[in-house]
Amino acid sequence: MKKMKLDERIRTDLGPGEGLLGFFVAQIPFKFWWFFLVGPIAVLGIKTYYIAASDKGMHFYGMNIVGQIEQHDYFPYDAIRVLEMKSGWMQMPLRFEFKNHNELKVRAQRKGAKTVPKLTDDLINTLKEKLKVRC
């Protein structure tokens, strides 16, 4: 999905009085052992998310194989217990731990083409202010 279309879609999902701080693409890579089991088809196991940060919470958009939004989840900042960030040059590993004891491990895009929404330093600093962050 193009960056501008995604921006419009995210803004329609924002609540009243909620401002968009930024959004980025993140992926859950396939498990390497699947490659030995099913071969190159294992690459289809990559799950892509667009994660948007707003004034009041985080929006998670799950994408299907053809790049269309399949699911939308919203979590206020107080529902996210911990955000763990690790260092990375091209991608930054993130782990969201929620208060309902679920967790989401993704790799956020840091560098790439201009058409891809990336995790910027400004957005990282904003998330550090809003959430309890472990680095």
Regions found by a protein language model. Give the residues of each.
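Phosphoinositide-binding peripheral membrane targeting modules
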Residues: 40-50, 54-95, 102
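Anionic N-terminal interaction surfaces
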Residues: 1-51
